[in-house]
């Protein structure tokens, strides 16, 4: 089997102008970035914004192994298969962050014969969205520090600045830094730090904004610091929301590319799902819904993180609600949840599949709480055995959830036909009756308790002293009615990454909150979740290169 990049480079790409004709996008609707990439103009977005939306399919997964379970690959393969069976389909995905690409992932544009192309460009600088978000974020930092240097008319307490700088790399050395050193001409010394770009609130804002005006309003509502009297300082107080919007005026437009099979793909925005809401942009998803009969999208990590946030945070901003949710599972991950060591996952172990099924079962039950029908997709691997597959199908039958084996990595669209047909059957039965887990009127404590007890399976929530004080403060500021975005390990339902399967009776500890008032949610921090990742001992970057003719090597 060829590597992902070898497969990608063997495909003869069609001009993007030709690819998008099938969904009614013309040449004048595009802002081209070469022959194979484009941004969609606001003229076209506005032209279709009142059209009736098509069907929406959300792809999520069980709690993943460190290698991931193939959500993006399955999403792409499903979209290709839907097109192959005659359903006009688009896909809406997140764009990858360069940090993890250079770190552990090596690439994030699908895999095998289910990829979005050109994968080298998408994984590297693409159309410059990450650069624009990084620049806007750091422009805010520079303007904030300049305000303090020039007299601090707003009375900002430099000890209580909560806005950090960002860079689109994994760089642990930048987590805690001191700025303003070198004497009075260089600013006022203070502690600062860097997050990875995809953790920036500006990334979340870009992905939730519905147009330029909404983007500007959300940017204005960002809290950057507190005054000496402990009242919040917003971007609007600095009067710089216009400048930040200007920097992002092109980045807000969705990017168009194609799959190996020529399915039009909107790839736009990329917040992490463990420290942010983990979904691609509202603009991309909404536009796809109005251009196609079926839209396939994904939410990051497992359904306890990405799908919950998609349904509680993103869906209220969409023109329609999901018609079906596809939960991707792999037998290797189920065996890991069943107690098998990572080194032994390739060995047949039917009992471990049965034991690990508790994880998948809870995810199915959780999605049903939102009133949406579920389909399980088994992402097929070479080491899977007939006995293990039969056991999983039997277990799914017992809880009355349809299940299909999919081999889109190896077989592309053909490997997803059975899954596509099952999804269409579920969608066209029209059983979806979406409801949020909590209401806006619930307090922050109530929202978190519902997520912990009903989604995670936990017993209760423990709020540390700082979090308790913040709850009182946030209520005074009127922030207590915002949705909650849980920052939690992706590997477990709990806040302990080693507690696999479907644990019960545990507590979730909230150590502090981070207000993301521009994005419109409050982040609750649990465990040791990092907003600036580090690199592994042997980063993927060590195997990357470029040939004399400019061909990328080592992306996978």
From Swiss-Prot:
InterPro entries per record: Formate_THF_ligase, Formate_THF_ligase_CS, P-loop_NTPase
Keyword Methyltransferase annotated? no
Q: Does this UniProt record's set of keywords contain Nucleus? A: no
Gene Ontology BP term (one): tetrahydrofolate interconversion
Q: In which pathway does it act?
A: One-carbon metabolism; tetrahydrofolate interconversion
Q: Which reaction does it catalyse?
A: (6S)-5,6,7,8-tetrahydrofolate + formate + ATP = (6R)-10-formyltetrahydrofolate + ADP + phosphate
Top class in the EC scheme? ligase
Name the residues that bind ATP.
65-72
> So which domain of life are we looking at?
Bacteria
Q: What keywords sit in the KW lines?
A: ATP-binding, Ligase, Nucleotide-binding, One-carbon metabolism
Kindly give the Pfam families that the UniProt entry links to this protein: FTHFS
Q: What is its EC number?
A: 6.3.4.3
GO MF terms, alphabetically ordered: ATP binding; formate-tetrahydrofolate ligase activity
Q: Which family does it belong to?
A: Belongs to the formate--tetrahydrofolate ligase family.
Classification via HAMAP family? FTHFS (MF_01543)
Name of the protein described by the UniProt record: Formate--tetrahydrofolate ligase
Q: Can you name the source organism?
A: Streptococcus thermophilus (strain CNRZ 1066)
Q: Which gene codes for it?
A: fhs
């Amino acid at each position: 089997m060829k590597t992902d990049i070898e497969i990608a480079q063997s495909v003869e790409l069609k001009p993007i102008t030709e690819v998008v004709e099938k969904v009614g996008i013309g040449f004048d609707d595009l802002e081209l970035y070469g022959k194979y990439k484009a941004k969609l103009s606001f003229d076209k977005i506005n032209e279709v914004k009142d059209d009736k939306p098509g069907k929406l399919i959300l792809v999520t997964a069980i709690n993943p192994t460190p290698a991931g379970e193939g959500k993006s690959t399955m999403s792409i393969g499903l979209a290709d298969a839907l097109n192959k069976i005659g359903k006009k389909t688009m896909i809406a995905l997140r764009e990858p962050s360069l940090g993890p690409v250079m770190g552990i992932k090596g690439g994030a544009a699908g895999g095998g014969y289910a990829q979005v192309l050109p994968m080298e460009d998408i994984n590297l600088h693409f159309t410059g969205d990450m650069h624009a978000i990084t620049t806007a974020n750091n422009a805010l930092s520079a303007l904030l520090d300049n305000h303090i240097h020039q007299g601090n008319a707003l009375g900002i307490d430099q000890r209580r600045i909560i806005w950090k700088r960002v860079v689109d790399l994994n760089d642990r050395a930048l987590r805690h830094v001191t700025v303003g050193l070198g004497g009075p001409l260089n600013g006022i010394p203070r502690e600062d730090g860097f997050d990875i770009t995809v953790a920036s609130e500006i990334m979340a804002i870009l992905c939730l904004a519905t147009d330029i005006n909404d983007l500007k309003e959300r940017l204005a509502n960002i809290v950057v610091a507190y005054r000496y009297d402990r009242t919040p300082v917003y971007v609007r107080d600095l009067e710089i929301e216009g400048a930040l919007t200007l920097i992002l005026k092109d980045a807000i437009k969705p990017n168009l590319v194609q799959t190996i099979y020529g399915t039009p793909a909107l790839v736009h925005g990329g917040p992490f799902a463990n420290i942010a809401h983990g979904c691609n942009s509202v603009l991309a998803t909404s536009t796809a819904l109005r251009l196609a009969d079926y839209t396939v999208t994904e939410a990051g990590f497992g359904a306890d993180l990405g799908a919950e946030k998609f349904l509680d945070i993103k869906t209220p901003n969409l023109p329609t609600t999901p018609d079906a949710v596809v939960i991707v599972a792999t037998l290797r991950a189920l065996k890991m949840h069943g107690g098998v060591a990572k080194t032994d996952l390739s060995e047949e172990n039917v009992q471990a599949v049965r034991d690990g099924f508790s994880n998948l079962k809870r995810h199915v039950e959780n999605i049903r709480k939102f009133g949406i029908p579920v389909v399980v997709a088994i992402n097929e691997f070479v080491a899977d055995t007939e006995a293990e597959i039969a056991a999983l199908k039997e277990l799914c039958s017992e809880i009355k959830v349809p299940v299909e084996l999919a081999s889109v990595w190896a077989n592309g669209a053909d490997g997803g036909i059975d899954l596509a047909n099952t999804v269409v059957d579920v969608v066209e039965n029209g059983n979806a009756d979406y409801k949020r887990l909590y209401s806006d009127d619930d307090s922050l404590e109530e929202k978190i308790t519902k997520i912990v007890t009903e989604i995670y399976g936990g017993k209760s929530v423990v709020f540390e002293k700082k979090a308790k004080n913040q709850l009182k403060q946030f209520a005074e500021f009127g922030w207590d009615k915002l949705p909650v975005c849980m920052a939690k390990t992706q590997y477990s339902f709990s806040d302990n990454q080693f507690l696999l399967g479907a644990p019960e009776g545990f507590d979730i500890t909230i150590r502090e909150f981070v207000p993301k008032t521009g994005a419109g949610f409050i982040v609750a921090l649990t465990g040791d979740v990092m907003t600036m990742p580090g690199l592994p001992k042997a980063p993927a970057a060590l195997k990357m290169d470029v040939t004399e003719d400019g061909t990328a090597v080592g992306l996978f």
